[in-house]
Amino acid sequence: MIKLECLQDPSPRKRRTKLLGRGPSSGHGKTSSRGHKGDCSRSGYKRRFGYEGGGVPLYRRVPTRGFSHKRFDKCVEEITTQRLNEIFDNGAEVSLEALKERKVIHRETSRVKVILKGALDKKLVWKDAAIVLSEGVKSLIEAV
């Protein structure tokens, strides 16, 4: 959430400082660019931080809390055939729960894609519909 006290002044541009009250030829003489009368012309006056001349300031234009789709996104992880070879025994059932128990995938993961890298020597039973096999892995399983 954006807070008023968290806002920072934008870094000043590298520009020559304005010399005020140094005669009419300077362009900033007499009233020192403050105009005639009013609060702004008096000494001791300072504009409030974030003030943009009466328009709606940035910290009020920007929504304080937005919406992120991250909570609802499906968490998909990739796992290689080489890693499956190391983890599972021959004839073992491969499911999301089995992968989570062995701490191969994160507990938030809702889908797994198996990618061909290395050989898959073992005959595995694919239990879960959430486990997607790449084309290379499918052809490798059919060959085994």
From Swiss-Prot:
GO CC list: cytosolic large ribosomal subunit
GO-annotated molecular function: rRNA binding; structural constituent of ribosome
Region (Disordered): 1-49
Keywords: Ribonucleoprotein, Ribosomal protein, RNA-binding, rRNA-binding
GO biological process: translation
Tagged with keyword Ribonucleoprotein: yes
Keyword Metal-binding in record: no
InterPro entries xref list: Ribosomal_uL15, Ribosomal_uL15/eL18, Ribosomal_uL15/eL18_sf, Ribosomal_uL15_bac-type
Function: Binds to the 23S rRNA.
Family statement drawn from the similarity comment of this UniProt entry: Belongs to the universal ribosomal protein uL15 family.
Assembly and binders: Part of the 50S ribosomal subunit.
Protein name: Large ribosomal subunit protein uL15
Gene coding for it: rplO
